[in-house]
Amino acid sequence: MSAVIIDGKAVAARVRADVARDVAEFRAATGRQPGLATVLVGDDPASAVYIGGKRRSCVEAGMADLHQHLPADTPQDEIAALLDSLAADPAVSGILLQLPVPEGLDGAALVGRIPPEKDVDGLTTASVGLLARGLPGLRPCTPSGIIELLDAYDVELSGAPTVVVGRSELVGRPVAQLLVGRNATVTICHSRTRDLAAVCRGADVLVVAAGKQAIIGADAVKPGATVIDVGMHRTEQGLRGDVDFDAVREVAGRLTPVPGGVGPMTIAMLLRNTLLAARAAAEVGSLV
């Protein structure tokens, strides 16, 4: 029997609808409009497309689009000054610096200018520390979107043998920490893992964020397992993931497609984070 296909578009649409409703209620109750400041340095076509999608989604959710576009030759200190200004601006609920930045700029240092309470990407050292300690904070969008998908399909995480393939700072490590926070029993695999397929076959839940096309085949999947494919690779046949979809769908119990699985969740969770940041700021403001 073929796997149940996890519909990321449908789950993301529900999250977006919930956020839009909650934004309207927030604005009515507080008189404030959540604002997302996206910062794009340079004219990289792919980055421009990504930012455009985030900006449109922001407006559709009823938030203020506070976009900032800087030339590629903008000095580091000028970008830092802009980020500091946005951090101090009460109209800005969340700040997102589109990565990568142009060559010659220190992207990590620039991201570090964003205060954790406005770090809607969940990428700053402070945000990473809050996640590692299990303390409240804004979580990285793609990892939190993965958890949202698992919850939407009633995947039991507590006690579940779970394997994460990939240890990147953007997805692998944070999703492993989120899964541990849900009491899953987590193993992290990477390029030096011995007999990767054998390790993966022990998983009830398998999250693949390796950045290598079709690294996971049917031989690496336990029958009935839930498989989340985070990879995205452009090929002559279209977008493909880190999982051999056609082979794995005949073994897995649930499986995300590429495209249409994890991808749509990222912007949906960005919108949710921006609303959460706006709510937290309003609560702090009410106490001042």
UniProtKB/Swiss-Prot annotation:
Name of this protein: Bifunctional protein FolD 2
GO cellular component, one term: cytosol
Family matches, as Gene3D superfamilies: Leucine Dehydrogenase, chain A, domain 1 (3.40.50.10860), NAD(P)-binding Rossmann-like Domain (3.40.50.720)
Keyword Hydrolase: yes
Coiled coil feature spans: none
Keyword field: Amino-acid biosynthesis, Histidine biosynthesis, Hydrolase, Methionine biosynthesis, Multifunctional enzyme, NADP, One-carbon metabolism, Oxidoreductase, Purine biosynthesis
Species of origin: Frankia alni (strain DSM 45986 / CECT 9034 / ACN14a)
Listed GO MF terms: methenyltetrahydrofolate cyclohydrolase activity; methylenetetrahydrofolate dehydrogenase (NADP+) activity
SUPFAM superfamilies found in the cross-reference section: Aminoacid dehydrogenase-like, N-terminal domain (SSF53223), NAD(P)-binding Rossmann-fold domains (SSF51735)
GO biological process, one term: methionine biosynthetic process
